[in-house]
Amino acid sequence: QTQPGVYQRTSQVFEVTNTGNWSSKKYLPLGYIENTQAHTSLFWQIEHNGSWHYEIGDQNTHFYLCVSGPTEVQSHWFKNLAPGESFTSVPVAVGVTDDSFERAVGELTGYRRLIRRPNRDNENLPVIFNDYMNCLFGDPTTEKELPLIDAAAACGCEYYVIDAGWYAPGEWWDSVGEWQECRERFPNGIKEVTDYIRSKGMIPGVWLELEVMGINCEKAKNAPDDWFFVRHGRRVFDRSRYQLDFRNPAVISHVNEVIDRVVNE
């Protein structure tokens, strides 16, 4: 017997998925589609810094748009709810306008300005110099930093950030995780450099990537496996680094200790 038309569907979808905490690593968490016959457009964004998914398909002779955070099929994520429990999905925004991409982008921009958290940057956006891009590329030393600090101050910068590499000699990629200053790079300590930054009227900053430990980090070698993401009985690593599991209170204590030490010392 032929299925009634109202229940028919193709079982095909156009879908875009992002997995992980880098929410724009492959695609931006937004989309736009035009109806050229009706001269309308549909646009959307997913307001989430983790895994997300959207899809366009057909059901019961209608097209549908599904916009969401992580899913079980695409991201292997789910949440069981007991009777009386509830769960709020990640926030999304969906809008309709005429068939103008520029108009849709304008409406989305206006919406973003409305939902932005009030903060001092709205009125006073500081000028920040970071020593990584087009400068030291993760190879800082006292000798290299001082002339850059002078130049940044002369340009009117308000913050000066010492980026990656301050914590280890040589190739440091797979040994990060303890966040101790490297005396080979800063013979008199990194405080000499941060004090010099302050003497030039700027606020110092340092790069921290607290969510990872390199596979050759001594602390990672001595830490128990439950500090890290584990799959099939082994630590998960990507590009020679382990990912810390912040569900473990010991991991949070470690991170708090690092921040307190870096800020106060």
Label the predicted regions:
Residues 147-150, 188-199, 257, 261:
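Alpha-helical scaffolding segments of alpha/beta enzyme cores, especially the outer helices
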Residues 124-126, 135-140, 183, 210-265:
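Active-site-adjacent "subsite" loops/lids of carbohydrate-active enzymes
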Residues 167-220:
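Acidic/aromatic-lined carbohydrate-recognition and catalytic surfaces
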